[in-house]
């Protein structure tokens, strides 16, 4: 028999929807938007690291971190 804990009681409502599937596409478009925004974020970080995005007055060398 599983022991009841206060953390389990708090998290139980999150698990009450287990196994249920939203009809149609559900939240897929929202997820796609956030994935696109995350991709843009990663591209900006890559461009800063690769110095293809020039930021005046910002030194991006490893020596500047030390």
Swiss-Prot record:
Cytoplasmic side: 2-27
Gene Ontology cellular component annotations, sorted alphabetically: photosystem II; plasma membrane-derived thylakoid membrane
Entry keyword Transmembrane helix: yes
Keyword Cytoplasm in annotation: no
Record GO biological process: photosynthesis; protein stabilization
Lumenal compartment spans: 48-66
Localization per record: Cellular thylakoid membrane
Disulfide bonds: none
Segments crossing the lipid bilayer: 28-47
GO molecular function list: phosphate ion binding
Keywords of this entry: Membrane, Photosynthesis, Photosystem II, Thylakoid, Transmembrane, Transmembrane helix
Knocked-out gene: effects: Not essential for photoautotrophic growth, however PSII is less stable, a considerable amount is missing the oxygen evolving complex, and it is missing PsbX.
Protein topology in the membrane: Single-pass membrane protein
Free-text remark on how the cofactor is bound: PSII binds multiple chlorophylls, carotenoids and specific lipids.
Pfam families, per the entry: PsbH
Subunit record text: PSII is composed of 1 copy each of membrane proteins PsbA, PsbB, PsbC, PsbD, PsbE, PsbF, PsbH, PsbI, PsbJ, PsbK, PsbL, PsbM, PsbT, PsbX, PsbY, PsbZ, Psb30/Ycf12, peripheral proteins PsbO, CyanoQ (PsbQ), PsbU, PsbV and a large number of cofactors. It forms dimeric complexes. Part of a photosystem II (PSII) assembly intermediate complex PSII-I; crystallized from a strain deleted of psbJ, it forms monomeric PSII before addition of the oxygen evolving complex. PSII-I includes 3 assembly factors not found in mature PSII (Psb27, Psb28 and Psb34).
Family: Belongs to the PsbH family.
Task performed by this protein: One of the components of the core complex of photosystem II (PSII), required for its stability and/or assembly. PSII is a light-driven water:plastoquinone oxidoreductase that uses light energy to abstract electrons from H(2)O, generating O(2) and a proton gradient subsequently used for ATP formation. It consists of a core antenna complex that captures photons, and an electron transfer chain that converts photonic excitation into a charge separation.
Protein name: Photosystem II reaction center protein H
Organism phylogeny: Bacteria, Bacillati, Cyanobacteriota, Cyanophyceae, Acaryochloridales
